[in-house]
Amino acid sequence: MGGTHTRYALTTEWVLAAPVGRIFDLLTAPEDWPRWWRYVESVVTVRQGDAAGVGAVRRYTWTSRLPYRLTFAMETTAVVRPVAIEGTARGELSGTGRWDLRELPRGTCVQYTWQVTTGKAWMNLLAPMLAPVFEWNHDQVMAEGGRGMARHLGVPLLAFRGTSLRRHQAVSSRGES
């Protein structure tokens, strides 16, 4: 069991009534996230990156609605101002994360794609039963991030969509046809 890891493909979308540049600036300053994102316990810079931030390594500690925390290091691997930020995680979560920002007539669509495996043995052991709960928990953390960003920017969060919500909607639509 020591080599078993559970894979997750998680996608979150926020739509905020703010220009893409303001959102991009917040996302590229993760050391400030604990001030506005409730479940970000700490972000510590381990290594500085280049002028764009590529090569930076930060250690994140996250809490959640469930009674556990996750810690991992994230290296920024690509930055395309002001539309994309990509990184590689290693630690209790390993994989890739990518922020994509798209300007809309009424604001900005922010999409986060998180392709990770879990490194905690207990999570992997319980994943066959609890994976939907872990996905729900991820959605709760991300929903709070969208609300926190909106509060911090002083703008409305116009929409939120997460992985477990989409899965639930897909099941519901099949049942109604």
Name the predicted role of every residue range.
Residues 9, 15, 75, 100, ...:
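Conserved beta-strand segments that form the floor/walls of ligand-binding pockets within enzyme
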Residues 17, 79-81, 104-106:
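Structural motif
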Residues 28, 71, 124-125:
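Generic recognition of short, well-ordered alpha-helical segments
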Residues 88-144, 160:
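Beta-strand/loop substructures that line and gate deep hydrophobic ligand-binding cavities in soluble
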